Amino acid sequence: IIFIELILNFTITGIPSTSNRDAYVESNEAFKQLNEAAKKDADADGVKFYRSEQLSHRTRNDGALFKYNSISTFSSVSSAAIEDYFTSIGLQTSFNAYSSYGITPLTAALFSLRYEYSTGDTSFPSESSLLSSASYMADGNNQTTLNIYKYEKSLPLGFVINSSTMSEWDLSGSDPFTIQNSLVTTAISGGSTI
């Protein structure tokens, strides 16, 4: 009986619900072209390290799949401290993955997020500009354009911050905007309202 149930379950849910591998690799060449455009742009600006993100993820590891440095990642050895930090500032987390979903201009800058891939608009139109585009065939016959946008206000990988800012930054609470605002007010005005 168990064997019959396994066969029926696999036949009903296993085969029809699997994804075609082509859906994962059809845009690889477009990403390769745009990754090269990002590297060339970063090199021209003297930037050695930066991160990129995709507006809408296909997997939890798009950075690894499409070969770009990403905030979003899946790892079976994810740190609970990083998960807590991401959650407190409003980014999506689960017990073994972190995502850029929920990113704001401030968190994008803090994480050195310099480029964003999108088949439409960017997350922050007033803070970014179109760098390049590449086309590919989606689903075998639909022409799709992938854009890469450059954030104009990205911070470098390392930057100096007053030690009192870190000790006074209030990461408690459930509102990520209050927590982000706490960082800014603590860094700029020593915690006074601005």
Predicted regions span which residues?
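A structure-centric feature marking long, well-folded core domains of fungal metabolic enzymes
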Residues: 28-32
